Amino acid sequence: MQQLTIAIDAMGGDFGPQVTVPAVVQALSQFPELKVTVVGDRDAISTQLTHLNYTLNPRFSIVHSDSVIGNNTQPSKALRHSRGSSMRMALDLVASKDVDACISAGNTGALMGLSRFTLKLLPGVERPALISPLPTKNNQRTWMLDLGANVSCDAETLFQFAVMGSELAEQSIGRKAKVALLNIGEEEIKGNDQIKRCAEMLNQCQNIEFIGYIEGDKLYQGIADVVVCDGFVGNVCLKTSEGVAHLFLDQLKSQLLTSKFKQILAKWLFGDVISSLKGLNPDQYNGASLIGLRGIVVKSHGSADISAFNNAIKEAVHEIKRQIPNRISDRLEAVLLERHY
């Protein structure tokens, strides 16, 4: 059995060890081959272990850190003053190959900057990208990138995102991924120069199954396996979608919980429907991967609860098993060779 090792930034996110530590304990029971190094304030971590009645063992180790990078800290400042922080120390463990992956719910900009600094980019990669799956019809998924790592992107960067996103998606779906560019229309004349130029490049690439442009209202139809956009558009789109999903689920819950009779009636009449709607909960898709690096980094939502953070750990486990950085590197090399001939 392959041993899997992960470093956790225990102090990142809105709740710190109150969420990260129970999620780790849960993951250790789910994956017998998993070993976790939890980086953060030793006393705060130990307090949570006491609450859980969990005893330290060789599969759960603590590395003490003296500081935390705040959510409002500028990436440039975080880079200069990161030594001794839980995020930096967790990433250093990946860089030194003491662990296979790192997970943090901390400052996104700081995580991206520190990841680039400590792990470096894969050969040929201009910028890393944040990618995460979205729920679609028939319980399928669509992977979307970039979700906020890069506010603006040129055509070459978008093209690289398409290649990297395809490889990650294909390791889950087991077939060639259908790739689309997010645009304001499906017609060839629509979009800015970067999108049009990227579309030309993708049309010429036999290594990618490019299906053209896709509009925002088609994101959840399962038309494309991978949707590519810059980080500004992707982040706004993702946050809007999550807000609508939470609003819908909260409204549904408030209506069904007004009386015991309504609860029983709803479960009897709409049990399957209610069960399927749980798939819209963004927590099930927590864990955006920062791809394009020489190591595995998974970004959890700062507001993630225990279950959501556990899903981020599951994503890291999947990427370790599938050796995602190596596969992305090989795919990029194959595309580069194709473009030269």
Swiss-Prot record:
Keywords per UniProt: Cytoplasm, Lipid biosynthesis, Lipid metabolism, Phospholipid biosynthesis, Phospholipid metabolism, Transferase
Top-level division of the source organism's lineage: Bacteria
UniProt cross-references to Gene3D superfamilies, sorted A to Z: Isopropylmalate Dehydrogenase
InterPro entries listed in its UniProt record: FA_synthesis (IPR003664), Phospholipid_synth_PlsX-like (IPR012281)
Pfam families for this protein: FA_synthesis (PF02504)
The keyword Glycoprotein belongs to this UniProt entry's keyword annotation: no
Principal location class: cytoplasm
Reaction(s) this enzyme catalyzes, per UniProt: a fatty acyl-[ACP] + phosphate = an acyl phosphate + holo-[ACP]
Entry EC no(s): 2.3.1.274
Known role: Catalyzes the reversible formation of acyl-phosphate (acyl-PO(4)) from acyl-[acyl-carrier-protein] (acyl-ACP). This enzyme utilizes acyl-ACP as fatty acyl donor, but not acyl-CoA.
UniProt subunit comment: Homodimer. Probably interacts with PlsY.
Name assigned to this protein: Phosphate acyltransferase
Source organism (scientific name): Aliivibrio salmonicida (strain LFI1238)
